[in-house]
């Protein structure tokens, strides 16, 4: 029942006891090293609860996606620490692998800490059906070469009611933290249209002065993103600083990728913010 959090001096997770004291004995946590392409890929499954897991404690190699939930409902993810991975740590989505689409909703995600070559929390990019009602509290990004908190609807899905640090999963014991993150928040809408019965046609168009030729879906509506509420996040060192390539952590020296926006790919007036700060590390 204890909350897990992270000590930057020790570079280790710990538990918070009822008196607010730090407990560094995390021997109760399940250890998984070299988890492969997916540690868990669940499709069309409801009522999942994963918790108290330490990834890459002794070996940081051969770890890609951690938890992928495709077309799943009523999912709880609590107390997850990933020392490093090459892809998303927690990812809800909805694809066509069942032969039909299925909406996903009711996610309770709490106390997620990690370093990733991709995103710590990612909705999509497989969005063949709607994904709604997701509550995420207490995240700590140690480094991310993409985003800390990402939403990508590419296949017509409606992403709605996503909350970061609302307190829905329980008390907010700490402000969320994002260190060394290329784009702390990334929200995008595109038209890949990876849906059943899609029709496609070639199009030629000019974008930012460049002529592009793309195969685009013609019979699937573009997705929607609605009611995204973000609060209580401290952000610093905005660059792709994951330790995935080796050194933990390499200071910014101009060689790492950077992204100017805090929110990328979305119209800012449509998003609500409370107490969200940025401190640039370069």
Spans of features found by a protein language model:
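Extracellular/periplasmic carbohydrate-active domains that bind, remodel
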Residues: 1-282
């Amino acid at each position: 029942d204890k909350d897990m959090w992270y000590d930057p001096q020790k570079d280790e997770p710990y538990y918070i006891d009822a008196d607010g004291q730090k407990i560094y004995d995390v021997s109760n946590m399940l250890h998984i090293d070299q988890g492969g392409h997916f540690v868990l890929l669940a499709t069309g499954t409801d009522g999942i609860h994963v918790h108290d897991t330490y990834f890459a404690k002794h070996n940081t190699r051969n770890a890609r996606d951690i938890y992928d939930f495709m077309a799943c409902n009523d999912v709880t993810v609590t107390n997850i620490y990933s020392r490093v991975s090459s892809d998303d740590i927690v990812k809800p989505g909805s694809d066509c692998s069942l032969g039909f689409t299925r909406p996903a909703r009711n996610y309770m995600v709490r106390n997620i800490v990690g370093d990733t070559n991709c995103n710590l929390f990612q909705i999509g990019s497989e969005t063949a059906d709607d994904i709604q009602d997701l509550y995420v509290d207490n995240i700590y990004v140690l480094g991310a070469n993409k985003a800390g908190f990402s939403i990508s609807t590419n296949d017509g899905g409606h992403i709605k009611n996503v909350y970061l640090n609302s307190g829905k999963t329980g008390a907010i014991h700490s402000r969320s933290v994002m260190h060394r993150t290329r784009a702390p928040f990334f929200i995008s809408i595109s038209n890949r249209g990876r849906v059943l019965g899609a029709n496609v046609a070639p199009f030629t168009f000019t974008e930012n002065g460049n002529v592009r030729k793309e195969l685009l879906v013609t019979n699937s509506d573009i997705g929607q993103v609605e009611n995204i509420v973000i609060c209580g996040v401290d952000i610093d060192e905005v660059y792709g600083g994951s330790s995935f390539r080796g050194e933990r952590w390499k200071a910014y020296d101009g060689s790492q990728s950077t992204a100017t926006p805090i929110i990328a790919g979305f119209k800012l007036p449509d998003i609500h913010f409370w107490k969200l700060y940025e401190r640039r590390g370069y």
